[in-house]
Structure formats: structure tokens, C-alpha cells
């Protein structure tokens, strides 16, 4: 759904790799910092100019902007496995920080985390391999929980399709490791 008055697109996908309940949804919200000058939906193999909502399977949204050459349009994106409202709540986590501020905060966290181990070796290739492997090992498990409107930790259960209290983690990172 395109919401022009809020420079926003909301929706969900049911795409998954199997083994999840029927109510599985990955809800998303995208908010842009410029108004739309063009909007359309895509569905049934056609582009419907001016329409703001599509409900069939395999649909999409198209938006356009009036920009000057080189002007950047920023998009703020959040998702939730719980609800569209929760996706909106998750978007608030970004606050008013810019893309560059968020990227720098991420770099600082990774530098601090990777810097906990010091490797002494003059071979740049070995250092690069070690820190690349350390980085990948720290990507997992992934957090699969969210904070609700009351600040409580909740998660969508891929086992029964319910929203339950507490933490949940997923993806060990070793699913494609063979012995």
C-alpha cells in the first residue's frame, strides 16, 4: 500500500523457505524523505498508474520523485514478523539519525567487537582471512525478537505462529557446513 500523504509504503511478504505456519508474514514499512510525484501498483502483470493499493499475489509498488541531478532520496526501512504496527514501532528505533550516523555507529560496534582479539602476524592475507572469518562467525545467531510498545521483549514463533514473550534467536550460521 502506498500512502502518499506520509511518503510511505507498507506491506508484507509471505516468501519463506518452508516449515513455517500459515500466518507467516514479514511486514515492512518504507518512509522516504521526499514526496511522491508518481505512484503505481503492480499486479496481474500490469502497472496501474495512480493506484495506491494492490491485494493480489505477487504485487508491488512503484513510486517516483522530482529531484535535481545528483540529489539523493533517503529511505528509512523497518520490518517485523509480528505486525505492520510493530514494523512502524521498529522504525522508531532509527530516531532522527542520518544514514551516515547509523553507518558510523555500526562501524564502531564492529571495530570494537573485532578488536577484542589481537592477532600478531605480518601476513596481511592471513590477517584478512582471520578477521573475515571472525566477522562471519559473529553474524550468528540472529536476533529474532522485537520490543513491543511497552518495551517488553516478544517474538513471532515460527513453530506455532503466535506472538510470545521472551527472546528468540535463529540461524546458527552453520546450516551449510558439511563434515
Model region roles, listed by residue range:
Residues 170-179:
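Aromatic-rich carbohydrate-recognition surfaces in CAZymes
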Amino acid at each position: 500500500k502506498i500512502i502518499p500523504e506520509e511518503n510511505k509504503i507498507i506491506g508484507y511478504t509471505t516468501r519463506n523457505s518452508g516449515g513455517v505456519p500459515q500466518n507467516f508474514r514479514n511486514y515492512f514499512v518504507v518512509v522516504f524523505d521526499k514526496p511522491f510525484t508518481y505512484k503505481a501498483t503492480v499486479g496481474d502483470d500490469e502497472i496501474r498508474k495512480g493506484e495506491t493499493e494492490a491485494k493480489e499475489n505477487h504485487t508491488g509498488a512503484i513510486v517516483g520523485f522530482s529531484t535535481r541531478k545528483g540529489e539523493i532520496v533517503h529511505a528509512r526501512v523497518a520490518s517485523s514478523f509480528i505486525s505492520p504496527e510493530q514494523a512502524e514501532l521498529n522504525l522508531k528505533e532509527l530516531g532522527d539519525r542520518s544514514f551516515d550516523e547509523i553507518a558510523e555507529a555500526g562501524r564502531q560496534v564492529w571495530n570494537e567487537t573485532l578488536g577484542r582479539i589481537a592477532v600478531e602476524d605480518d601476513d596481511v592475507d592471513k590477517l584478512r582471512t582471520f578477521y573475515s572469518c571472525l566477522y562471519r562467525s559473529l553474524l550468528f545467531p540472529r536476533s529474532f525478537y522485537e520490543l513491543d510498545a511497552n518495551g517488553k521483549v516478544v517474538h513471532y514463533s515460527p513453530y506455532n505462529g503466535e506472538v510470545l514473550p521472551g527472546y528468540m534467536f535463529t540461524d546458527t550460521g552453520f546450516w551449510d557446513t558439511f563434515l
